[in-house]
């Protein structure tokens, strides 16, 4: 199969991003992730398969509409007390409710698309990439959780002279990362915690493979621009020892940068849309600590 014909499951294409790589970029979000971080801002990305979601803030209300319940052939969507209710155990994934919904309250996260389809959308903004040094960033979920599709996207983008970056959690076979780095222009790599037991308790996997993979990048792709990022999560890795320990293991080179990211809850509403509970309810970032931490991190840049 030609690279441009390869297909994968994508849940969002976001244009005009300026925070996920150099210049103005188009972000392509792929479904699936080997980690299950309770602070994840894209919970709809974690499972590989498409997922049905309901956003009540966009609903026209059962009194005005109710088309989703009428369209559902299994009774998974119903009207109870004037409210739209969803029984996931009865849902067969036919998406009749989604097609019937006029407001977008009923939706599906995840759609099968080809490399050609994705890059056609990416290329629409080619003039912005040229002027800003931007391009394509693969994200997720995990950008390499669908390795065949992701690698085909990167190779085909390279043929079309599109600057490429991936955002990655680093947990997959080293050979996959090696293949990606051979065609990447830059890499954004998360390191959340050096303590493997603590990492596994929080995310579901240990940190050994992640650290092995970033070590592989440092050794075999020494000139690749790399941004290492750590989300600072209260109660998980919010100590000077944790963050400075990660910074210490990163080579001090001009092409390697490090960022500690402040915890936020911008993705919290989506947990409700998916029928899940947000486990960090009420948790807030310590702004004073982050300010002190960033002052300390600046000393590594000298």
Curated annotation (Swiss-Prot):
Q: Which organism is it from?
A: Bilophila wadsworthia (strain 3_1_6)
Cysteines engaged in disulfide bonds, as pairs: none
Pfam families, from UniProt?
A: Fer4, Fer4_12, Radical_SAM
GO MF terms on file? 4 iron, 4 sulfur cluster binding; metal ion binding; oxidoreductase activity
Functionally, this protein is described as follows: Involved in the degradation of the organosulfur compound 2(S)-dihydroxypropanesulfonate (DHPS). Catalyzes activation of the (2S)-3-sulfopropanediol sulfolyase HpsG under anaerobic conditions by generation of an organic free radical on a glycine residue.
Residue ranges annotated for the Radical SAM core domain, each copy included = 19-301
What is this protein's gene name? hpsH
Which reaction does this enzyme catalyse, per its entry?
glycyl-[protein] + reduced [flavodoxin] + S-adenosyl-L-methionine = glycin-2-yl radical-[protein] + semiquinone [flavodoxin] + 5'-deoxyadenosine + L-methionine + H(+)
Q: Which UniProt keywords apply?
A: 4Fe-4S, Iron, Iron-sulfur, Metal-binding, Oxidoreductase, Repeat, S-adenosyl-L-methionine
Q: Which cofactor does it need?
A: [4Fe-4S] cluster
Q: How is the cofactor bound?
A: Binds 3 [4Fe-4S] clusters. One cluster is coordinated with 3 cysteines and an exchangeable S-adenosyl-L-methionine.
Recorded hits in SUPFAM superfamilies, A to Z, give:
4Fe-4S ferredoxins
Which pathway does the protein contribute to?
Organosulfur degradation; alkanesulfonate degradation
Q: Which family does it belong to?
A: Belongs to the organic radical-activating enzymes family.
Q: What is its EC number?
A: 1.97.1.-
Q: Where does [4Fe-4S] cluster 1 bind?
A: 33, 37, 40
Where along this sequence does the record place binding of S-adenosyl-L-methionine? 39-41, 141, 190-192
**GO annotation terms (biological process):** alkanesulfonate catabolic process
| Residues that bind [4Fe-4S] cluster 2 | 59, 65, 68, 101
Q: What is this protein called?
A: (2S)-3-sulfopropanediol sulfolyase activating enzyme
């Amino acid at each position: 199969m030609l690279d441009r014909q390869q297909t994968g499951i994508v849940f969002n294409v976001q244009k005009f991003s300026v925070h996920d790589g150099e210049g103005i970029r188009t972000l392509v979000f792929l479904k699936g992730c080997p980690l299950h971080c309770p602070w994840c801002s894209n919970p709809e990305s974690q499972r590989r398969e498409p997922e049905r979601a309901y956003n009540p803030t966009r609903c026209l209300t059962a009194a005005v509409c109710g088309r989703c319940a009428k369209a559902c052939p299994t009774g998974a969507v119903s009207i109870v007390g004037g409210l739209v209710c969803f029984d996931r155990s009865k849902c067969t994934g036919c998406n009749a409710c989604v097609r019937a919904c006029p407001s977008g309250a009923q939706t599906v996260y995840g759609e099968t698309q080809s490399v050609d389809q994705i890059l056609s959308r990416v290329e629409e903004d080619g003039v912005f990439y040229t002027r800003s040094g931007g391009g394509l960033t693969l994200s997720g979920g995990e950008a390499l959780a669908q390795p065949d599709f992701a690698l085909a996207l990167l190779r085909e983008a390279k043929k079309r002279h599109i600057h490429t970056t991936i955002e990655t959690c680093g947990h997959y076979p080293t050979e996959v990362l090696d293949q990606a780095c051979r065609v990447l222009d830059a890499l954004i790599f998360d390191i959340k915690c050096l303590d493997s037991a603590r990492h596994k308790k929080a995310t579901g996997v240990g940190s050994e493979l992640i650290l092995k993979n970033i070590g592989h990048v440092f050794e075999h792709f020494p000139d690749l621009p790399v941004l290492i990022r750590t989300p600072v999560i209260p109660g998980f890795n919010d100590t000077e020892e944790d963050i400075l320990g990660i910074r210490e293991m990163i080579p001090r080179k001009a092409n390697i940068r490090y960022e500690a990211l402040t915890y936020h809850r911008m993705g919290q509403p989506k947990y409700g849309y998916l029928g899940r509970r947000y486990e960090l309810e009420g948790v807030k970032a310590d702004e004073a600590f982050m300010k002190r931490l960033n002052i300390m991190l600046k000393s590594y840049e000298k």
